[in-house]
C-alpha cells in the first residue's frame, strides 16, 4: 500500500466537549479551548521564533530566496563540466589522473579566485582530522595546475598562483571571471589508494572503491559564498552539480562500475555479459550477469589492448563521481520501475546492479539486487521518480560501512538479512537527500541523514510488513535524551562533543522529529509538503529556512514553535494525565506539560460502549509557560480509558504517565 495514503483523525463530535479550567486562581473558568483538528494552531499566537541568519535575510532581499520556500526569481548556482582520465595500478595501489574542469560563473559576482577541494589530502601525513584515519598514506601529488590557459605555481604572493591548505586549494586567477563567464582549469595528479580502515572507501586486496579522487570545485552559493571548510572526516560534504565525462583504465578482466552511464560496453564487456545485461533490462527476476564460472573462464570482459581496458562513463547533473573495481566481483542485475522520470508521460525504468565477492554470499549479497530494486521503486513512489540510469550496490572494504555516492553505494562488512536491507535502503535513500536535493551536509547533517533515516523507516515498513523502525529511532533518541547528553541539531557536523551526540542529532532525533511533524500536520499534509520540498529544490541547494518555509507554505501554518523546539533546543517532551475526577455530569481531565517542549495533546477517550473519541489541544496553549490544562468531557457513556498520543507519534520521555487508569 502506498504509505502516503491519507488518513485523518475524526473531528470532535457533538457528544463531547472540552472546557479549559484555570490551573490557578481559585478555579475561575478560563476561555474555552478550541477543539482543533490535528495540527492546527491559533493564528492569534505567533509562537516561538526561529533564529534567521543575516545571510539568509540578505539572500531574500536579493531575490535568490523567499519566505515561502520557493527558490527566488534571481536564484542562481554555479556549474562545472569535468573531463577526467585515470589509470589505476592495482599492484602499486596508485592512481594517475588528469583532467579539465570548465567552471561556469552563474553568480552576479566577479570572481578573482576560486577554491578547489582535494579531499584525498585527509590521508596526507600530519593531516587534520577528527575521526579515526589510521592510514597516513599520502595526499594528492599535483604535477600540473593551470587556469585560463596559464600554468600556475605554488605561491602565497599576490597575483596568479595557487596554495594548498589541507583539503582546500585556493587558486588566484590570471584574469577576473565575470558573471556569465567561464574558465577552464587543467590538473594532473597522482595519489595512492588507502587500505581498508580508511573512512568511506579504499582497497581490500583486489577490491577497490575509489572516492574523492580528483580535484573538485568547491561550492560558491548565494548565502555563504565560498565553502572552504576542511574535510576532517566526520562531517560530510557540500558539493555542486555538474556533468562528468570519465575514462578509467584498468587491467583487462577487472570489472568496473561507476557513477554515470557506460558509453562503450562493446569495447569492454564480452558479448555474453552484454547479452545478459540486455535480459536484465526487462527481466522480472534477478539475472546473474557474471558468475564464478565466468570469472574462472575469463569471459566477463574483452581482452583489451596490451592487457588493459579503458571504461568510459558519462554522468549528467550529479554532484560527484565514484567508482569501484575488482578482479573478483560477481555481477547481478535487474531493473526497477521508477514512474515518469523524464516528464514525457510514460513510465520509465532504471538498471539495478549488485557487485560483490563470492564470499559475501554469507552476508546475503545474492539478495542485494532485490533489496535495491525494492528501495528504488518505493522511494520513486514515496518521493520523486529516480532520474538516473542505474543504481548500483557495491561490496567494498569493511570501512565503507554504508556510504552513498551518486548512483552508487559502498557497503562493507558482514550483515544479516535485516541489516543488509537496512543499510542498502538507507544509502539508496540518500539518492534523494543529498544527491538530488543538494543540502549542505557539513553545516546541517540532519537535512540529509535525518530525512534519509526517516525515509528508511518507511521503506523498511513496506518491505518487512509490520516492522517498526520509527520506534527504534525514537528509542535511540530518548536513550540519549534521558541522560542529558544530547545537543541541538543546528550545529556544524565537526562540532559535536561525541560521536553518539552527533549520531543522535544527525539521524535519530530528526527522523523522530519528522514523525512528530507528521502527527502535527496529519499524513496527507505532511506528505504533500515533504514531496513539494524535494520537487522545489531538485538539483539545487536548500538551506534549513527553505525547508521550514516550504512546510509552512504548503500547510498554511506557522510552525516556528516546532522548528525551535526540535532543532534549536534540547527540550524534552513529557505530557502527562495528572488526575481524572468527577465534576457533576462531567469528568475533569488534568493534563500536565511536565517537560519544556510544547506540542499538541492528542487524547483518545475510550468508552465502555466501544466509542473512541480523538481530542486535540493545540500546542499554543503552552507557549506562555502554562503547565496544566483541565479538559472537561462528558461522563456518560462511562469512560473506560484515557490515553495521550495513542498512535505514539510524539517522542515523550515518560509513557507511564500518559494513560488512565494506571
Predicted feature locations:
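Glycine/proline-rich low-complexity spacer/linker segments in large multi-domain proteins
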Residues: 126-137, 190-244, 265, 329, ...
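Solvent-exposed beta-hairpin/edge-strand motifs
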Residues: 111-154, 249-254, 606-617
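Hydrophobic helix-coil surface modules that form long, contiguous segments used
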Residues: 219-221, 225, 235-425, 454
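C-terminal motif of bacterial Sec signal peptides marking the signal peptidase cleavage site
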Residues: 21-23
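Early extracytoplasmic/domain-onset interaction patches
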Residues: 39-117
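A surface-exposed beta-strand-loop module
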Residues: 47-48, 94, 104, 133-206, ...
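Beta-strand-rich binding/interaction modules
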Residues: 257-258, 270, 324, 580-646
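Hydrophobic alpha-helical and helix-loop surface patches within well-folded domains
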Residues: 28-35, 48, 52, 56-59, ...
Amino acid at each position: 500500500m502506498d504509505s502516503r495514503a491519507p488518513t485523518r483523525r475524526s473531528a470532535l463530535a457533538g457528544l463531547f466537549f472540552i472546557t479549559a479550567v484555570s490551573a490557578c486562581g481559585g478555579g475561575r473558568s478560563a476561555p474555552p479551548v478550541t477543539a482543533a483538528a490535528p495540527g492546527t494552531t491559533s493564528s492569534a499566537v505567533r509562537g516561538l521564533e526561529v533564529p534567521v541568519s543575516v545571510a539568509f535575510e540578505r539572500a531574500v532581499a536579493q531575490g535568490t530566496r523567499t519566505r515561502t520556500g520557493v527558490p527566488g526569481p534571481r536564484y542562481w548556482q554555479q556549474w562545472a563540466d569535468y573531463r577526467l582520465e585515470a589509470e589505476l595500478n592495482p599492484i602499486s595501489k596508485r592512481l594517475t589522473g588528469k583532467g579539465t574542469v570548465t567552471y561556469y560563473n552563474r553568480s552576479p559576482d566577479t570572481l578573482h579566485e576560486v577554491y578547489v577541494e582535494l579531499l584525498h589530502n585527509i590521508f596526507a601525513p600530519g593531516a587534520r582530522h577528527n575521526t579515526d584515519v589510521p592510514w597516513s598514506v599520502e595526499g594528492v601529488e599535483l604535477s600540473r595546475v593551470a587556469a585560463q590557459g596559464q600554468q600556475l605555481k605554488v605561491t602565497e604572493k599576490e597575483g596568479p598562483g595557487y596554495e594548498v591548505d589541507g583539503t582546500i586549494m585556493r587558486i588566484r586567477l590570471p584574469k577576473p571571471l565575470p558573471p556569465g563567464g567561464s574558465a577552464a582549469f587543467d590538473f594532473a595528479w597522482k595519489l595512492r589508494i588507502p587500505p581498508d580502515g580508511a573512512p568511506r572507501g579504499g582497497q581490500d586486496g583486489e577490491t577497490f572503491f575509489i572516492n574523492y579522487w580528483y580535484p573538485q570545485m568547491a561550492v560558491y552559493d548565494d548565502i555563504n559564498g565560498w565553502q572552504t571548510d576542511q574535510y576532517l572526516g566526520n562531517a560530510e560534504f557540500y558539493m555542486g552539480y555538474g556533468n562528468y565525462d570519465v575514462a578509467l583504465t584498468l587491467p583487462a578482466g577487472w570489472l568496473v562500475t561507476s557513477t554515470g552511464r557506460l558509453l562503450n560496453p562493446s569495447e569492454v564487456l564480452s558479448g555474453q555479459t552484454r547479452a545478459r545485461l540486455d535480459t536484465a533490462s526487462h527481466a522480472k527476476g534477478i539475472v546473474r550477469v557474471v558468475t564464478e564460472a565466468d570469472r574462472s573462464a575469463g569471459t566477463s570482459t574483452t581482452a583489451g589492448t596490451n592487457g588493459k581496458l579503458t571504461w568510459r562513463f558519462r554522468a549528467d547533473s550529479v554532484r560527484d563521481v565514484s567508482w569501484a573495481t575488482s578482479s573478483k566481483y560477481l555481477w547481478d542485475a535487474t531493473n526497477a520501475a521508477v514512474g515518469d522520470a523524464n516528464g514525457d508521460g510514460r513510465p520509465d525504468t532504471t538498471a539495478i546492479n549488485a557487485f560483490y565477492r563470492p564470499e559475501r554470499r554469507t552476508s546475503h549479497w545474492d539478495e542485494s539486487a532485490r533489496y535495491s530494486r525494492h528501495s528504488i521503486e518505493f522511494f520513486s513512489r514515496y518521493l520523486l521518480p529516480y532520474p538516473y540510469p542505474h543504481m548500483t550496490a557495491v561490496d567494498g572494504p569493511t570501512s565503507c560501512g554504508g556510504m552513498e555516492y551518486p548512483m552508487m553505494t559502498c557497503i562493507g562488512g558482514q550483515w544479516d538479512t535485516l541489516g543488509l536491507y537496512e543499510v542498502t535502503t538507507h544509502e539508496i535513500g540518500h539518492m534523494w537527500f543529498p544527491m538530488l536535493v543538494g543540502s549542505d551536509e557539513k553545516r546541517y547533517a540532519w537535512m540529509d541523514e535525518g530525512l534519509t533515516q526517516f525515509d528508511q523507516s518507511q521503506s523498511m515498513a513496506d518491505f518487512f510488513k509490520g516492522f517498526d523502525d520509527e520506534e527504534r529511532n525514537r528509542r535511540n533518541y530518548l536513550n540519549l535524551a534521558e541522560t542529558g547528553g544530547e545537543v541541538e541539531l543546528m550545529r556544524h557536523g565537526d562540532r559535536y562533543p561525541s560521536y553518539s551526540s552527533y549520531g543522535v542529532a544527525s539521524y535519530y532525533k530528526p527522523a523522530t522529529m519528522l514523525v512528530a511533524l507528521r502527527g502535527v500536520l496529519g499524513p496527507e499534509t505532511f506528505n504533500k509538503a515533504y514531496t513539494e520540498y524535494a520537487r522545489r529544490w531538485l538539483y539545487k541547494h536548500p538551506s534549513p529556512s527553505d525547508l521550514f518555509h516550504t512546510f509552512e507554505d504548503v500547510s498554511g501554518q506557522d510552525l516556528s514553535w516546532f522548528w525551535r523546539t526540535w532543532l534549536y533546543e534540547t527540550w524534552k517532551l513529557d505530557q502527562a494525565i495528572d488526575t481524572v475526577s468527577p465534576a457533576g455530569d462531567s469528568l475533569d481531565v488534568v493534563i500536565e506539560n511536565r517537560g519544556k517542549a510544547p506540542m499538541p495533546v492528542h487524547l483518545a477517550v475510550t468508552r465502555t460502549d466501544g466509542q473512541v473519541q480523538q481530542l486535540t489541544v493545540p500546542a499554543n496553549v503552552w507557549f506562555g509557560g502554562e503547565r496544566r490544562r483541565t479538559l472537561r468531557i462528558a461522563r456518560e457513556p462511562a469512560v473506560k480509558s484515557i490515553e495521550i498520543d495513542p498512535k505514539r507519534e510524539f517522542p515523550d520521555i515518560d509513557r507511564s504517565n500518559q494513560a488512565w487508569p494506571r
